[in-house]
Amino acid sequence: MAFRYNTPDPELSIKLENPRHLSSGHLPRYIPGETIIGVVRRTTPGAVPEARVVVTLHGKCTSKIKIKRGNSESRYESSFNCLSAPMEPEILFSNAPLHIPQGEGMSWPFAVTIPSVVEDVRRADQRKHYTLPGGSTFPPPGSFAMYSESIWTTGEQVRASVEYYVQARIELSHVHRGITKKAIHTAKAPFQLRNVNIGPPITDFRLKRHQMTHMIAAYKLVPGMGDLTFGQKTRQTFMTTSVPRLTFKLNVILPHTLQIENESPIPIYLSAEPVTGSTTEIIHDVPQTIVIKSFMLRLKQQTLVQAEKHSSVTSEAVNLIPNTAIGALGREVSLTVMPRTSGQSEEPARVNLGEMLDFRMRKHGLQPTFKTYNVGRTYNLAWEVEGRVVGEKFKLGYTHQAKVLPGPSPYNEPDFERPAPRPEALPEYLELSEAPPAYSA
């Protein structure tokens, strides 16, 4: 199916024959290594003694930072070629007479291939402010666009983009009164470049465990405790040593790698284990219920934009699991801990919260983690648990770095070999994070 990307122009127009993912109002998408097939057409009648028609693949990543300070304004810009050295033009018609009769037209088919990898294009003077995106070679970045404005704080406006297009150019030469004159017309066909992760959707989300310790001080931890006296309430408020204490470790096992357009279920495990040595002896061998009231998972994206010696970081958050999700289940989610007087505590039972909440990477309009010379996108995954033990509230939370992979390559693509799926890592091999909590209440 053909799709026209520029307004039809009798002087010159482009028609791409093989775009994928066509939808109204959206540019077509290609992937690195793919060949773009199309046709350049001219319908303006006439004859010239010499003409030349070429097409060239273009890619550029640009950044612009504008800063207002009172009545003054500073602008900083940068632009890099995303496709290594300038791509060699494909010559479709060269240095020959061109005659187009009235009511007809002339077409030239073309095929240009998007590079699978590109090389460093920084000049020596640019290496001070702009870092290399990858190793000696790296994939071209996917299409990207962002705009940020913070008038009420720094008066800063930031724009960044990664853009690709095919450009056609026709040069018409003729001699007038002994002087060779040249008329030039161009046409552009923009498209989106979509990076892919070779193979089927991932099943290994790099699960890791975060372990956080919390203490509850309450008389209600003792079975059969009735209404509290005024003195007990006072001692509990000030958490005196006479108030029974339960100390437990909350284990949260969750992904450190996510993938766009991968709707496979993602596990999130919760478990709790007692810390007997820090628990009041009177409640040893007494099971305690930890009721999980809410769980929130948020993906925080940061975009770094560099323009000359100036840089800007903008942040935005996307809710993957809202804090109302557990309440919407209509049933209680709980964990049980029981400090043992003697012997080792039993292996704590796990709750697969991801399965309960049907957690999947649905479409959130996300970009994968990426870095170019002047633009980069990184992610942090923040979680928060709210719970109760014998009516006493607590809140725990943590933030860790996460990587968002591009979507999987299409299975029906003959150019891609499907590797065997990797099994999910077993819990006993998960890494333990002993870092202090971001907050605890």
Where is each model-derived feature located?
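Flexible, low-complexity coil/linker segments
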Residues: 1-18, 151-271, 403-436
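Eukaryotic beta-rich interaction modules
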Residues: 15-23, 32-39, 246-252, 273-282, ...
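Beta-strand-dominated scaffold domains
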Residues: 56-106, 192, 203-235, 282-374, ...
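Contiguous beta-strand segments within globular domains
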Residues: 28-41, 258-274
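Internal, hydrophobic beta-strand segments that form the core of beta-sheet-rich folds
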Residues: 40, 56-61, 110-115, 125-175, ...
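A cross-kingdom feature marking solvent-exposed beta-strand/loop segments within repeated
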Residues: 91-97, 122-123, 144-151, 176, ...
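Short amphipathic, basic-aromatic surface patches that mediate peripheral association
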Residues: 41-46, 118-122, 272-288, 305
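General structural concept
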Residues: 3-146, 387, 396
